[in-house]
Amino acid sequence: MPQTRSVDESFLALPLSALTDAALTRALDLGCEHADIRVERIRTQTISLRDARPEAVTDGEDLGLAVRVVHEGTWGFAAGVVLTAAEAVRLAEEAVAVATVSAAINSDRVELAPEPVYRDVTWVSEYETDPFELPDAEKTTLLTEFSERLLAADGVEHVQSSCMHVKEQKYYADTAGTRTRQQRVRIHPDFTALTVDRATGSFESMRTLAPPAGRGWEYLTGSSWDWGRELAEIPELLREKTKAPSVEAGRYDLVIDPSNLWLTIHESIGHATELDRALGYEAAYAGTSFATVDKLGTLQYGSPLLHVTGDRTTPNGLSTIGWDDEGVAGQEWDIVKDGVLVGYQVDRNMARLRGLPRSNGCAFADSPGHVPVQRMANVSLRPTPDGPSTDEIIGGVERGIYVVGDKSWSIDMQRYNFQFTGQRFYRIEDGKLAGQLRDVAYQATTTDFWGSMSVVGGPQTYVLGGAFNCGKAQPGQTAPVSHGCPTARFDQVSVLNTVQEAGR
């Protein structure tokens, strides 16, 4: 899609150059080896409905600036909300003071991997309709209409609906001379239907599979997702789910839809290949990683069919950017190739620690008040160029389960032992779907699971999934991230009955 949008004038009208000159000049005067400044404005809105009636509309805006320095080999950071040159000078001085105090306990001298200088460059994400330019009433009307379609169906007792959209505007400048201006928009619509068995008091739910996307309001009104088909199908699928038999625990061949597999990629590959986890720098929030650096180039992560890439360039990706929060341009690289671990996600400091020639652009802060940390790229399983369709993959399974949609999961602090559930499950008998199942969870270790992958679907099965709210760091930060993948088959995976397990 040709890029026709630009960064909003209201953001460009902020005193970006004056703040830059004040902060960076003062940092250099104080002897910093490196300094950078970020000015950010982040707008969020969430519209929530219950049973097709408005429940809440929440709006938020976060505007501020942050100064980060390297002084005598130590990080310093300070942030504020007053956009004046005097405040920028004060923040530079405060960041240097933080670095001076921290130097006494810093055992690893901070050095940044080199990056070309990008002078006065601009990037805007691919979207057509800015949701923040539409009246709330117009957005609520469409969400109400979609909700009413579900609520009118037999057996649907309640419908919970929401749509969250975000506009992120970011200016970055550093002492090397880079100056970047960026704007990106993302959206996450969600519709959940619920049915209640009044005789037993039990209930079941099912929600739309549409993933969050780096798109605008056109995601709900255009052709990139078939909302009409999905909303029409959910009530009948939900009725089938309520009558489905409980799964018999055992080992099955699994055919996993992209709507479920993206989350397994996120937890068992995405987080496991963040270099700060692999080095032990990140541990408190969800652990370190079994994929340690001594295994790079030798760890058999999965079958030879496993090809996983990281990127910050995929169109409509949630982690897609022009430049990261250290001024590094978006790139694509291999993480797992032919089943072997070959790469990590890194920022400039981690790249230098490992002797890499360059960062692959994985620094991100979720607000102007937070320091950038190493965050996840779009981490994706590549399809087989001439690979089979989903129906063809199912057709090759004698006894198995087809897994659709994400739900709950758990994974250990090394990103190794895990289990995942889903939205719906279908029994496969002699290559055909034979009705839904309930109470299914699949369980494995990361390398056993990916090692059991025997078929990878073609490009026609590929879907870009993802999440708005990947958590990391302390104080906690959230980041949006996409994971593309095709349908894939996994042989003889352990399946648990969740009801039986809960009663143990």
Q: Where are each of the predicted segments found?
A:
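N-terminal small-residue-enriched
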Residues: 1-504
